[in-house]
Amino acid sequence: MEQSGHEPGKNTFLSRVFGLQSDDVSTSIHTQELSTIPLDEDESNHGALVESEDDEDHNDGVRLLESDPGTSTQDSLESDTSEEDERINGINSDSQVIDTSRPLLSKKETMELHPFGSQNGRIMESSIKLGQPSSDEEDLINVNESLQPDLENRINPIYHEDKLDKALGNSSKNIRTSTFLDRVLKPNDVKKNSTKKRQNSHNYNPTSTYTNSSSNTFLNTVKGEKSSKKYKLKRPNILNALSVVNNMPERRLNTLSPKERALWKWANVDNLDLFLQDAYNYYLGNGFHCIILQKVLNILTLLFVVFVSSFMGYCVDYSKLPTSTRFSEIKIDHCYSQNITGFTKFLLFLFYGFVILKVIQLYFDINNIREMKLFYHYLLNISDDELQTIPWQNIIQQLMYLKDQNALTANVVAVKAKNKLNAHGIANRIMRKENYLIALYNNDILDLRFPIPFFGSQPLTKTLEWNINLCVMGYVFNEAGFIKQGFLKATQKEYFANELRKRFMLAGFLNIILSPFLVSYFVLLYFFRYFNEYKTSPENIGARQYTPMAEWKFREYNELYHIFRKRIGLSNPLASKYVDQFPKEKTNILLKFVSFISGSFVAILAILALWDPENFLNFEVTHDKTVLFYITVLGAIWSISQGSVSTEYHVFDPEETLRELAEYTHYLPDSWKDRYHTEGVKQEFCELYNLRITVLLRELASLITTPFILWFSLPNSAGKMVDFFRESSVYVDGLGYVCKYAVYDGDADAVKKHFGTDGNETTEQDAATEEQDIDSEPDEATKKMMQSYMYFLDDYENDDNLLGKYQIPKKRRESFDNTQYDVSNSNQKNQDDDSDMILANRYTWRKQFKPGQKPELFRIGNHVLNDKTFTQQGSNHLGIDESYARSQISNTAEESNRSSLYNSKYKSPTKGVLGLVKEYYKKSDVGR
């Protein structure tokens, strides 16, 4: 887009941050990274931004830098220093505040905005695009460069803060939920009619047909009132130290107190993704001392394996072992200087250099972890001792409290990025890459076949998974953690596909060189780790574990690792129970025979040893193999075979067991339906839940087979991978490009497919066919997304899930859930059982939508859903804003807000998010 006739005026924002005038930097900014803001025609029109009447003339707009969580740029609408001072003063007074997170409405579209009250007459066509900057691959895209004057003195306050607080307690109507889910779930005939309407509308803009429902949806907040009852936390209070944020230069950080230093770091975050990932890793690692201890012990483990193996190989004279009685007699003096020479010594020097680098990295990690400790302790008011028991939901709650106090005053961090600080946004930032990997493995994009006929597909191993992450994710995403925008251009497909092929082949070559050393190291590591376990408990050789592919198949979108690890750990007993239900008669017959033969030899040797215990034990049965050696080996074989024989009786109900197991694994393919009792389903499940010894052997074999897969097989999938990242990426304001399957809250209304098939921005025709794209989505992909959506709801809305990383819900009464509620019972009986029903009826979506049950009989929080509340609540919605501070103004409003989402429009299943979910659940097998 060309801009002419504008003099480059002074840019206050750029001059403050970079020390430059706008004309000095105008040639360094790509216009595709700017967004159009229409100028006001009438500044008195409630502070709204009004578009020029000429729809085709876009030169009247002002191009603004995109706000980005990974940069240090500030929201251009709030760049002026005087405006910032005004906002700071407005916190302590009743002055008016600009709501920068307010969505802009499309032209000629009038609707009510909630929960801020009615705002009619807002006419808008485009919205500010915030979230992700251009990547370092932008030199592949030919763009014009321009810079326009900022919107100084163009925006008037929209609402008073006291009006906002008052509105939070009021119910609102006509709340719109996620249009993305709406498109997925509503009937096909409705989709077709909607598509026709869009095709007939010449001025349709898919990015602006939404309200501010994102601030009302349950996904944008966590029920802080619930968690506060279990875990008393002090709210962050940083308003007294705000001057530090604006006035302290980085070179004087050492003069600050620990709390002020933590505040400065928070206010000057230049990459919110990396910061939240560090914060989550700190929570996952249980604090400063646990993380440092783990890192130190990892280095010591590496040193121990290499030192012991080298010492046993070069410093022991095994020829003297039979005749020696002391260790000093078989030890070789000065073995490292005399025996170790040439290539082996060179490898040891390389290893020592690697250890030195790890120690240096540990030093810098300690500094970063210490900074995170200060952030948790002083700003979130959470000590390290609490991290092992406190729920993650409380961490989110404290982050949102902190954001409410700091987002409007920080002068470096992108304000819009912090305004997206909610449960859904935080999960998307932490798992930006992992969400793509989940979709990549679930959609079977990768070709993992071994390039030899009749070998079939190679199981995914940790070694192969690590190489895929290095080759694919390390190239698709830039250093800031954002997807390179060249991958979103269809015209750049061949270029990036060729680059991926080169990376696969290079990685295969490096694996061939490193495989001998890796095989040696991991053989020793597994030997030291598992030998004593199998020696003392031989029956453990039949233990099973989930394979790496199973972990990616079972994991949900936006499911943080500690939640996934907990439910997978709880599923192990049920998985073993399911496998053990199937008879293993052929295996039992073979194991009994092996047990008999080995036991017989052990018995013979033991009886002969009684005649001459001192000499016979050293008697050589074969060359250099004594009786004691064979008694040890054959005894171990007997213990393993005898312990692996199945002698217990089990109740054979594989269908019930597998359905119960699916409550934890979230995996129950439609192809297994009506075949749960068959050997075929059992074999498919055992490929996901395999013997631990088999998994270990595959890992060792993978060190040899991985180079061939990287060299010959995976390059064939390069083009499909580029298509996958382009088709699976959507743009969300304040988040940037994320995996489309991980966007399922109210913010999905703001999702924009920024690029079309020709590499340009989306057109009206592209938007009109968006419905057809949704219809063409694979059923499994849609089910996976919907399943993740409902489990995300359960994780963050269910009282019982407000637990720490190592805690599980206590057993509760399930009598009401296990029995069908009989509406024909007498009123007296219903009154007697009312308290039992309230105690037993804890909410989960699986219970609420269980076939034959009535959703209205289930409660949420402290609110019981019944017919009376259905008639009284009407069309209330969850009017909770992103801000926890503002969401707890009125106890009455809090009580209604906790349950109103589920009360809304139950009697019309085609309206509202939960109605759509209910309608979808009736027609699918998700989660059953």
Swiss-Prot record:
GO terms for molecular function: phospholipid scramblase activity. Residues 201-216 have a biased composition (Low complexity). It is a multi-pass membrane protein. Phosphorylated by ATG1. ATG1 phosphorylation is required for preautophagosome elongation. It comes from the Eukaryota. The keyword Membrane applies. Residues 28-118, 188-216, 755-779 are annotated as: Disordered. The chain crosses the membrane at residues 296-316, 346-366, 589-609, 626-646. Residues 90-99 have a biased composition (Polar residues). Its main location: membrane. Residues 508-528, 693-713 dip into the membrane without crossing it. Keywords: Autophagy, Cytoplasmic vesicle, Endoplasmic reticulum, Glycoprotein, Golgi apparatus, Lipid transport, Membrane, Phosphoprotein, Transmembrane, Transmembrane helix, Transport. It is found in: Preautophagosomal structure membrane; Cytoplasmic vesicle membrane; Golgi apparatus membrane; Endoplasmic reticulum membrane. GO terms for biological process: cytoplasm to vacuole targeting by the Cvt pathway; mitophagy; piecemeal microautophagy of the nucleus; protein localization to phagophore assembly site; reticulophagy. Forms a homotrimer with a solvated central pore, which is connected laterally to the cytosol through the cavity within each protomer. Acts as a lipid scramblase that uses its central pore to function: the central pore opens laterally to accommodate lipid headgroups, thereby enabling lipid flipping and redistribution of lipids added to the outer leaflet of ATG9-containing vesicles, thereby enabling growth into autophagosomes. Phospholipid scramblase involved in autophagy and cytoplasm to vacuole transport (Cvt) vesicle formation. Cycles between the preautophagosomal structure/phagophore assembly site (PAS) and the cytoplasmic vesicle pool and supplies membrane for the growing autophagosome. Lipid scramblase activity plays a key role in preautophagosomal structure/phagophore assembly by distributing the phospholipids that arrive through ATG2 from the cytoplasmic to the luminal leaflet of the bilayer, thereby driving autophagosomal membrane expansion. Required for mitophagy. Belongs to the ATG9 family. Homotrimer; forms a homotrimer with a central pore that forms a path between the two membrane leaflets. This is Autophagy-related protein 9. The gene is ATG9.
